Swiss-Prot record:
Gene3D superfamilies on file: Urease metallochaperone UreE, N-terminal domain, UreE, C-terminal domain
Recorded name of the encoding gene: ureE
CDD domains associated with the record: UreE (cd00571)
Name of the protein described by the UniProt record: Urease accessory protein UreE
Role, per record: Involved in urease metallocenter assembly. Binds nickel. Probably functions as a nickel donor during metallocenter assembly.
Keywords tagged on the record: Chaperone, Cytoplasm, Nickel, Nickel insertion
Family classification: Belongs to the UreE family.
The organism's place on the tree of life at top rank: Bacteria
Subcellular location: Cytoplasm
Length: 200
């Protein structure tokens, strides 16, 4: 069984003909977030994907097998919620509430897309958005939550947190020097957004 253990950096330009000839590996979002997964190429060949922890594959990414061959990633259609609104403010409010719940969201021109969830669908409709369940590839924003299923402790969180603290410090006169190093959950008594001390 071949192993796919390298991803070509997105800024590296490969010849289009080379990429077009590469076999494809079609994966849903959840599988594209895993650094180790047994998968089957669209040609029927079984392969093992072994990538650095925290890697999130996107549609069009190119992997290199242990024999030097290329494989192109395709985002599989999956069940998602397509969220639209009659005005930008309503869509922005929906995005805010989803972000507050650390929900992975794909942001497009006039729409939001997220994994199907009946509770979130109900919340979004109550906010005044139109919510349709559909089959489509899902590519949420990268950033502070990496693939979106983890909160706080992946490759990009430290960078994003440090930047946020720097901006906060510039506006409030001080900053915390490092990100927290513990897991936490948000519940009814959550003090999300507060640092446990008063700002004078």
């Amino acid at each position: 069984m071949r192993t796919l253990d390298k991803r070509i950096a997105p800024n590296v330009k490969l010849a289009a003909s080379l990429v077009a000839r590469a076999p494809t590996l079609t994966l849903a979002f959840d599988a594209r977030c895993k650094s180790r997964v047994a998968a089957t190429l669209d040609t029927g060949e079984d392969v093992a994907v072994l990538l650095p922890r925290g890697t999130v594959l996107r549609d069009g990414d190119v992997l290199v097998a242990d024999d030097g061959a290329l494989v192109r990633i395709v985002a599989a259609p999956e069940t998602v919620l397509l969220v639209r609104a009659h005005d930008p403010l309503t869509l922005m409010r929906a995005a805010y509430h989803l972000g507050n719940r650390h929900t992975p969201v794909e942001i497009g021109d006039g729409y939001l897309k997220l994994e199907a969830d009946p509770v979130l669908a109900d919340m979004l409709r109550r906010l005044g958005t139109q919510v349709d369940e559909t089959q489509a590839p899902f590519q949420p924003e990268a950033g502070a939550y990496g693939g979106g299923h983890k909160h706080g402790h992946d490759a990009t969180f430290a960078e994003d947190y440090a930047l946020a603290q720097q901006v906060f410090g510039e506006h409030h006169g001080h900053a915390h020097p490092h990100p927290h190093d513990h897991d936490h959950q948000h519940g009814p008594g959550c003090a999300h957004g507060r640092h446990g001390h008063d700002h004078h």
